[in-house]
From Swiss-Prot:
It is found in: Cytoplasm. One of its GO terms (biological process) is trans-translation. The keyword DNA repair does not apply. Transmembrane segments: none annotated. The keyword Hydrolase does not apply. InterPro entries: SmpB, SsrA-bd_prot, SsrA-bd_prot_CS. It comes from Hyphomonas neptunium (strain ATCC 15444). This is SsrA-binding protein. It holds the Pfam family SmpB. Keywords: Cytoplasm, RNA-binding. PROSITE patterns: SSRP. SUPFAM superfamilies: Small protein B (SmpB). GO terms for molecular function: RNA binding. Residues 1-23 are annotated as: Disordered. The lineage of its organism: Bacteria, Pseudomonadati, Pseudomonadota, Alphaproteobacteria, Hyphomonadales.
Length: 161
């Protein structure tokens, strides 16, 4: 049943709803973690339609809880007056041990928690892949792009030759 519902998301079968492609360029991701999200019913239905944007969002630890801030899940058309607020703070569900590890990384090492992917797992539950990352400087971004381009050219040459 879950795979049938996942096929409704923009014709995708992997359950992916939204991806933060800019985060791989802007940040150097060291560690990833899967977190659950507390959603209301209209948000889940909107996600099943693929109407979400996590490009400008981030996660932060506040008062011993992990929150997703500035993520946009558009309103669901069939929910009329019982709809949700599109850019509200959403609580992320992680274990106590994972939360303490994340908060230590942010406080001590000055890292950032960035959302990478929003998707439905095999059981049909909405999950968010978050990464612990450090910001890249402009020269790091150029160097990363140059390495990627060289790898692409090298693969093209090896394939042709």
């Amino acid at each position: 049943m879950a795979t049938k519902k996942n096929e409704q998301i923009k014709g995708r079968t992997d359950g992916l709803v939204a991806e933060n492609r800019r985060s791989r360029r802007e940040y150097s991701v060291e560690d990833t973690l899967e977190a659950g999200i507390m959603l209301v019913g209209s948000e889940v239905k909107s996600l099943r339609e693929g109407r979400a944007n996590i490009a400008e969002s981030y996660a932060s630890v506040e008062q011993g809880e992990l929150w997703l801030i500035n993520a946009e899940i558009q309103t669901y058309g069939g929910a009329n007056r019982f709809n949700h607020e599109p850019r509200r703070k959403r609580k992320l569900l992680v274990s106590r041990r994972e939360l303490s590890k994340l908060s230590q990384e942010v406080e001590r090492a000055g890292r950032t928690i960035v959302p990478l992917k929003l998707y439905f797992n095999d059981k049909g539950r909405a999950k968010l892949l978050i990464g612990v990352a450090t910001g890249r400087k402009a020269h790091d971004k150029r160097e990363h792009e140059a390495k990627r381009d060289w790898a692409r050219d090298k693969a093209r040459i090896m394939k042709a030759g």
